[in-house]
A protein has these predicted regions:
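Active-site glycine/GP-rich loop and adjacent strand/helix microenvironment
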Residues: 1-37, 121-122, 136, 145-353
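Conserved AMP-binding loop of ANL adenylate-forming enzymes
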Residues: 112-148
Length: 353
């Protein structure tokens, strides 16, 4: 077993950080080192891979059954928990200080490339609670980190209170941004955007936000009473805020992951207008055949994500989501239903973590 302060672990973290920053680091050597760490610190993994016949990602359900964490000699610096919308139990993901530092770096660099881009200190409005309100919610943590890193410090804010959305504060911030011609970036859960656009329509409020404004929604509609097509949500955003559909971005993230998958382009390839996600040197989404578990370059299957920014647990995760593979990337198109895929049942039955 590698201890937390082992030079191997410390050096691996440095290599991962360099990979995130775009330095000339061999991705395969980083993945090999992550696999070596996984096999040394999670002995069950070798048996799991033997039984599944490949280096299959561990199922996301493993995080509900137990805390998969490599370093008993290092207390976790932070623990995030799942919402529990996909099952009764709330899963947990533990981060060591090194792991949290890598996650922060991944969130910041990913947002810089895909979301913020050319903007200089935009107003960033969050439709998620603050970290102090929801300390175990990874979306709140990540979106607050983006806001504090890139946003106008005087005007950026969460508009979520204990009783819901503070619409008066939202209107005040947006009116001021329009008056000053300052771009706005709005971040939040997919369903939050739907509810907010609905509420603003009833109030009769809408804006033509300054050029360069954009939105980022995540979380999808798992466990919700209403499913909205991605194109329908983008249309509502355009109608309410004057933001073109090409600037209404979606992101896929999980409590179990340290990184997030952003839209690769504006093509709508999924049955509900989902867009393909962009792979990066430190983050890849692949689709596995639901029965044979082989990778597929085209068509539907199980989504497996390799997130090289994870150093505290296996970096290969079988998400339980259904994906559509294309030349542009993988679109996340829903959850795998019970009994739909041999791969899920096999992975769950093969081993207990």
């Amino acid at each position: 077993m590698f201890r937390y302060k082992d030079p191997f672990v410390q050096n691996l973290a440095e290599q991962i950080a360099a990979l995130i920053l775009g330095e000339a680091i061999d991705r395969e050597s980083v993945e090999q080192a992550l696999d070596e760490l996984a096999l040394a610190n999670l002995p069950q993994l070798a048996d799991y891979w033997r039984k599944t016949g490949c280096r299959l990602g561990i199922p996301d359900s493993a995080f509900k059954n137990s805390h998969v964490y490599y370093f008993p000699d290092q207390p976790a610096a932070r623990v995030f928990r799942t919402s529990g919308t996909s099952g009764a139990d709330r899963g947990a993901a533990c981060y060591s200080p090194l792991g949290l530092k890598l996650m922060d770096l991944s969130i910041i660099e990913n947002a810089r490339r895909h979301l913020i881009q050319e903007l200089d200190r935009p107003v960033i409005i969050r439709f998620v609670p603050t970290v102090s309100q929801a300390p175990e919610m990874i979306m709140a943590y990540g979106m607050e980190l983006i806001a504090t890193t890139f946003g106008d410090k005087a005007r950026s804010a969460s508009v979520i209170t204990g009783s819901g959305v503070d619409f008066e504060r939202l209107r005040s911030i947006l009116d001021q941004a329009v008056s000053d011609d300052q771009p706005v970036v709005m971040l939040g859960g997919s369903f939050a955007f739907v509810n907010i656009c609905d509420a603003l329509e009833k109030l009769g409020w809408s804006w033509q936000l300054p050029e360069g404004s954009r939105t980022l929604d995540g979380g999808g509609f798992k466990g919700r009473s209403r499913v909205v097509r991605a194109g329908e949500l983008r249309s509502a955003i355009t109608k309410t805020f004057g933001i073109p559909a090409g600037r209404a971005f979606n992101v896929f993230g999980m409590t179990e992951l340290a990184s997030q998958l952003y839209d690769a382009n504006s093509r709508e390839i999924g049955p509900l207008d989902e867009r393909p996600k962009s792979n990066l040197p430190f983050l890849q989404a692949r689709v596995r055949d639901s029965y044979m578990l082989a990778y597929r370059d085209r068509g539907e299957g199980l989504v497996e994500i390799m997130d090289s920014c994870i150093i505290d647990r296996p970096h290969r995760v079988l998400t339980g989501d259904l994906g559509l593979a294309s030349e542009d990337g993988v679109a996340i198109i829903g959850r795998v239903e019970r009994g739909q895929a041999r791969g899920c049942s096999l992975s769950l039955e093969s081993i207990k973590f």
